[in-house]
Regions:
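N-terminal secretory signal peptides
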Residues: 1-36, 58
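N-terminal secretory signal peptides and thylakoid transit peptides that target proteins
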Residues: 27-51
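Signature of short aromatic-glycine-proline-rich micro-motifs recurring in repeat-based ectodomains
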Residues: 120-134, 228-241, 424-435, 525-541, ...
């Protein structure tokens, strides 16, 4: 993988570049009938108090709504930027909290830029490419758990060939720098810092012992020579977004786990394994990490079941650094983006999840048992019903349960081959479902659909492109644009204000676009204007007041159809009026991803991943993914 590949391409785009499928791009067949009849381009769709939950949703122009109500945001929006640093509004400041390679424990050396950090310390420092994060208050201490999604091998390996490790030591360093960091932070006279001698500090990486739980645990397809029980895995891979349970545990989400596997031999010929490999994108080459060359666990010819042990949501107790993380197979095996958990009115736990790949699906899991504050929660995520979303053109939808009766698969098979189960029940293909967020002040949820350049595009044979399971990615109401390079955010309200209900109404909160260079569908929805242009919404959190914080991971060329968008950014959205304003811009080449708040909400922590600019140390230094802490100058609440 080249430096340009690593920094500018998503996992889907990398697959498309290196494992191309024939296609013809037909940009003239943009289906705007679905747009015009629903008013997506006339006004943002708002759930009004008078809208029937399963009936027609009210159409409210953002200009009209904003005329009735002044902006709720306590900041002046900033302009798009193209430089190599972070920008925030006037009256706000930012500081670096921690960067890749910074020590987490006493006695660990400071980052050595010339050596890209020492191998011996790579399991004792802050990992690379920060992503989802959550803050926990534990006995008065503020503890952040944060993901490290992947590595830029050309940056963190001194010895490499074409960004590939050349020996087992290099592979081990890469494995150490990924996973999860748990760290205590505190605010002092000089701002925020990591408490290096905290008992909570911990690194979890690609070799940390894990326990497998739920319906897939112990299944033959999870058994290996090293683990004949199929219940004890090593490591958590490609940790993308995050979640937080009501009982105070951290949920880290395994996304593009397929990229770590490969072989110099032939792929397994077993029909079940081969079909699963194809559905999840496991091939001989992987993403050029070359783990399989130096670590037999990742060689699928030698350990063909190992990929089945990854692709899950992992539960971690941040209060106990000696606890064993648990892979919760009941929540399905997909390319998990994040996990948004909420308690239903009857006490059952609901978890929403997106599968981040073109044409994949949106999921919901509802626990069998009820959450009782102070009760035993150790098995709450082991038994429940996993469902997948069907979006109808009349702006209603249904969660379809993935049961043995509905799919013809066993419970264990559903947990291991979740995508196959979802295809069997006719789930709606989506434009790469990313983060899901649940509004804490209104019974509704949102999902970022980041982009899909293959939506509605034809192959050489004249058929519509499909996902890896053969499901056609035709234009549909919730994904209404062909060759969608901008993305959109879908919102739904469950029937009866109950997230455990199987029925919901939906609309599109925003369709990103560029009205300065495009017309029609590609101009975006009415709440997009020259002052808030963005593409590829990815990360998303909703704060305690209901403000939607949208983070992007898209094209930052600032040219052509992306002119005026600048670097990746974070925007604030009002769910009532549809107003969206730009709050932060990241350095060139970086994704803005991961967000949490201090206990008093006077500090916002934001992740800056894979900067191409020499951020944050300046010219001549290696770019380092970092967490920045943002405050208001008057120390009031952020936002």
């Amino acid at each position: 993988m080249t430096d340009i590949d690593r920094r500018t391409l998503s996992a889907d785009e990398w697959d498309e570049l290196h494992f191309p499928r024939p296609e013809v791009q037909d940009f003239d067949r943009v289906v705007d009938a679905a747009l015009s009849r629903r008013g997506f381009l006339r006004g943002v769709l708002v759930f009004g108090s008078g809208a029937a939950v399963m009936g027609t949703t009210a159409l409210v122009s953002p200009q009209t709504a904003q005329a009735q109500q002044t902006s709720r945001f306590a900041f002046t929006p900033i302009a798009a930027q193209t430089d190599g640093t972070v920008h925030v509004p006037e009256g706000y400041t930012w500081q670096r909290l921690i960067s890749w390679g910074d020590p987490l424990f006493p006695g660990v050396a400071e980052f050595d830029d010339a050596q890209a950090g020492a191998l011996a310390d790579s399991d004792k420092v802050f990992g690379e490419n920060t992503d989802g994060m959550e803050l926990f208050v534990i006995g008065g201490a503020q503890v952040i758990a944060v993901n490290h999604e992947y590595t830029n091998n050309d940056v963190n390996l001194v010895n490499h060939v074409d960004a590939k490790p050349v020996d087992a030591e290099g592979v081990r360093k890469l494995q150490n720098l990924q996973g999860v960091t748990v760290m205590e932070v505190r605010e002092g006279a000089n701002g925020w810092e990591v408490v290096k001698d905290s008992r909570f500090n911990r690194r979890i990486d690609h070799n940390t012992p894990m326990r497998l739980s739920g319906p897939a645990a112990g299944h033959d397809l999870l058994k290996t020579e090293a683990d004949p029980t199929g219940t004890a895995a090593l490591g958590t891979l490609n940790n993308c977004g995050s979640g937080k349970t009501p009982w105070g545990t951290y949920l880290t989400c395994e996304e593009n786990f397929n990229g770590y596997f490969g072989t110099t031999s032939a792929l397994p010929e077993d029909a079940v394994i081969a079909a699963g490999y194809k559905r999840y994108g496991i091939n001989e080459k992987g993403f050029d990490y070359d783990y399989h060359v130096f670590d037999a666990r990742f060689d699928v010819a030698k350990t063909p079941h190992e990929p089945h042990r990854h692709g899950y949501i992992v539960e971690i107790d941040p209060a106990d650094p000696t606890s064993t993380p648990v892979k919760r197979t009941a929540l399905g095996r997909i390319k998990h983006e994040n996990a948004a958990a909420i308690v239903a009115p009857d006490g059952r736990v609901v978890v929403y999840m997106g599968d981040d790949e073109r044409g994949e699906f949106l999921y919901r899991w509802v626990s069998r048992d009820k959450y009782v504050p102070g009760g035993d929660t150790s098995t709450l995520l082991e038994e429940g019903v996993l469902s997948v979303a069907k979006f109808n053109d009349d702006m209603t939808g249904t969660w379809v349960a993935l049961t043995p009766d509905a799919t013809g698969m066993t419970a264990a098979e559903i947990a291991i081959f979740t995508r196959t189960a979802a295809s069997k029940v006719g789930a709606t293909t989506m434009d790469r479902p990313e983060w899901v967020a649940v509004n804490p002040v209104s019974v509704e949820a949102y999902c970022c659909l980041t982009n899909n350049s293959r939506r509605g595009v034809l192959t050489d044979a004249g058929t519509v492109r499909t996902n890896a399971g053969g499901d056609p990615m035709t234009v549909n109401a919730v994904n209404p644009r062909e060759a969608n390079n901008y993305g959109q955010i879908v919102r739904w309200r469950p029937e009866g204000d109950d997230h455990a209900s199987d029925a919901f109404a939906w609309d599109l909160y925003v369709m990103a676009g560029n009205p300065t260079v495009a017309q029609g569908a590609m101009a975006g929805s009415a709440n997009i204007n020259a002052g808030n242009l963005f593409n590829s919404p990815d990360g998303m959190m909703i704060d305690s007041t209901g403000i939607i914080w949208i983070q992007t991971d898209g094209e930052d060329s600032n040219e052509g159809e992306f002119a005026g968008m600048g670097n990746n950014q974070m925007l604030a959205g009002d769910p009532v009026t549809g107003e969206i304003q730009r709050f932060l811009t990241g350095p060139f080449g970086a994704e803005v991803t991961g967000l949490t708040w201090s206990a008093d909400r006077r500090t916002m922590f934001v992740g800056i991943q894979h900067p191409a600019a020499p951020f944050p140390d300046g010219e001549g230094k290696r770019p380092r993914s970092s967490i920045v802490a943002i405050k208001r100058a008057d120390n009031a609440l952020v936002g």
